[in-house]
A protein has these predicted regions:
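Histidine-dependent nucleotide/RNA phosphoesterase domain, centered on the 2H-phosphoesterase fold
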Residues: 1-178
Length: 178
């Protein structure tokens, strides 16, 4: 069974910067994501039959602090199908957040989970299937978009079936000085 662990990112389709971004890409047939913004922490291609991964997740997430991420870059990448993904990312990611993801990833692999992709911090904003528009053109357009950094505390974590129901959800604790 394909599953994934995600942390929700509290952005809104109607945010002014997102409206400006869509205008910036006017004339390009982007399918903009309208909700469910998140960062996939671990994508599990296959889970051993009968394996309950909630124990591993609780081990790591019960004491984890909510990361503060500053999204300060817009970029585009292509997936194996050739589709282009327009996304937000952060250039400075807290080491504690990266260590948490790596520990969860390692523990899941150690119990036999098949994980074929490495972690890549990004929040999908839109998808483009027009193969006539080349990646360098899209990247140049993304880089020319001027945006102010967006700092956010990320607290809501979901473990879900791929395109299915939530298996486990929790909230990471906030640091007391936030």
């Amino acid at each position: 069974m394909k599953t994934y662990l995600e942390i929700k990112v509290p952005i809104n389709y109607d945010d002014p910067w997102f409206e400006e971004l869509r205008s910036h890409f006017a004339g390009i047939p982007v399918r903009w994501q309208k909700d469910f913004y998140h960062i996939t922490l671990v994508f599990i291609n296959d889970t051993p039959k009968g394996m309950d991964l909630c124990t591993i997740l609780k081990k790591h997430l019960v004491t984890a602090q909510a990361p503060v991420l500053t999204f300060d870059q817009l970029d585009v990448f292509a997936v194996s199908s050739g589709m282009h993904i327009i996304h937000l990312t952060a250039t400075d990611v807290p080491d504690t957040f990266l260590a948490l993801i790596e520990s969860i990833h390692d523990d899941m692999k150690s119990v036999g989970c098949v994980i074929l992709s490495d972690f890549m911090l990004h929040v999908t904003l839109g998808r483009l299937k027009d193969f006539n528009i080349q990646l360098p053109v899209l990247r140049s357009l993304a880089k020319s978009f001027s945006m102010s950094p967006l700092s956010m505390v990320l607290t809501d974590v979901d473990y879900r079936e791929f395109r299915g129901k939530t298996i486990y959800e929790t909230q990471l604790s906030r640091k007391e000085n936030l």
